[in-house]
Amino acid sequence: EVADRLPFDFPIVVKPENSNALDYLRCHFEGQKKVFFFDTREEYLTMVRSMNGSDYRGKLILQEFIPGGDDAMRVLNSYSDTDGTVRAMCLGQPVLEYYDPKSVGNYAAILSRGDTLLYDKMQRFLQAIGYVGFSNIDMKYDSRTGRYVLFEINPRLGRSSFFCRAAGINMMKLLTEDVVYGRRGKCIYNETTALWSNVPRGILTRYVTSPALREEMKQYKALHTLWCGGDLAPARVYRLARYYAAQYKNFARYYFDKSKEK
């Protein structure tokens, strides 16, 4: 019945209301993923029937699929002080997402960007609603309309928010200055381009589909969340090597080009 009442056509994107909630992580059903992409009503119903046979009783979020690949996404991180004034904004252009079932939709690599018009619009919105704290805003550029479609606002920094540090912005320092010391400076608007990545360079070279982006990334040394030159304990280096090696296997097995498949 839900599929028949959708205000948009297939393809669609479907995800649990909280894919990190214990009731979803602990349930098991065939084809379980963090996020689903469906071309047809039949594909969607097959998943729902499978899910209904599990212990999951939460809600599902259904969204229209906006055409475009990973690089059409945008993520905006900001910090609003205790008075509701935005103090920092950093825009990122994801160039690659994860595709394995447990991580699909999470960003694997991001180029930090600047966009004055978008900063202005989102700053006015956040201040108008009296938002306080960190915000992690996911959106996608819709080439059909020339506008951004805002998906969600997360009230925390995301796992990929280290791209802000690559651009030179320390969100945690801003929080400390505000809450602990009561210091509030002018709003910082990032305009620096820098590369953050949580996967090896070889994966970016192979799976980033835009030739222009692949060429642009060659200009930047990637900042990696997991790598720390001051902590080269053999056990840690070994675990990192295993993690990076596993990414080659995961992408080879699960990757698909959204811009072509949909």
For each feature predicted by the language model, list its residue ranges.
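Phosphate-binding site of ATP-dependent enzymes
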Residues: 38-100, 113-121, 141, 147-149
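Glycine-rich phosphate/pyrophosphate-binding beta-alpha loops
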Residues: 96-99, 103-107, 154-168
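Peripheral (often C-terminal) accessory segments that flank ATP-dependent C-N-forming ligase machineries
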Residues: 177-262
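Oxyanion-binding "anion nests"
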Residues: 101-105, 112-137
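Glycine-enriched catalytic-core subsegment of oxygenase/oxidase enzymes
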Residues: 166-173, 179
